[in-house]
A protein has these predicted regions:
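M16/MPP (pitrilysin/insulinase) zinc-metallopeptidase core fold and M16-derived inactive scaffolds
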Residues: 14-29, 41
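Amphipathic alpha-helical interaction elements
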Residues: 9-13, 68, 72, 110, ...
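Conserved small/polar residues in nucleotide/adenosyl-binding loops
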Residues: 1-5
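Buried hydrophobic packing residues in well-ordered domains
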Residues: 6-8, 24, 63, 87, ...
Length: 157
């Protein structure tokens, strides 16, 4: 996963300032939790949410609408910077320990896209634009959607 992907995921559903958290969860009250994640080794993105069965269709529609809105609508400077600062904050302590450095470079090797130092990654993150984010999100399409629910007649434990 490149740094642009990480910012796109943070904006869509990977942080408490994301569209999924602020709109689908907080504003619309359609789920208990709602978050996106990017699987860097498969190139797939997932959205996980906890919803009431009766709200499942509305929640799915709202989740997909937020993705479409990010692809085509306005992205405010404030929301982009909030997500960028959140990621930069998470990267701040990488070089504070040998384990942090080791983990950073281990993941860089596994990704196979060339080694990038933490400083280079932070600089790249600072350079990501709204259009970069839109371009990443435009590449996504719905592949599968499923709803896990309990069987009728099974008592809550």
């Amino acid at each position: 996963m490149c740094i642009r992907d990480r910012l796109a995921m943070a904006l869509y559903g990977g942080s408490v300032t994301s569209r999924l958290f602020l709109n689908v969860r907080e504003r619309d009250h359609l789920c208990y939790y709602c978050a996106s994640s990017f699987q860097s080794f498969t190139g797939s993105m997932a959205v996980n949410s906890g919803v009431e069965h009766a709200d499942a269709a509305r929640a799915e529609a709202a989740i997909l609408k937020e993705l479409d809105d990010l692809r085509t609508g306005p992205i405010t400077d404030e929301e982009l910077e909030d997500c960028r600062l959140s990621l930069l904050s998470g990267m701040a302590g990488i070089e504070d320990s040998l384990g942090g450095i080791e983990t950073w470079y281990y993941m860089e090797v596994l990704r196979g896209s060339g080694l990038q130092t933490p400083d280079e990654a932070r600089a790249a993150l600072r350079a990501v634009t709204k259009e970069d984010v839109r371009a990443i999100l435009r590449q996504l399409s719905l592949s599968v959607s499923y709803l896990l629910t309990r069987e009728e007649g099974i008592a809550d434990v």
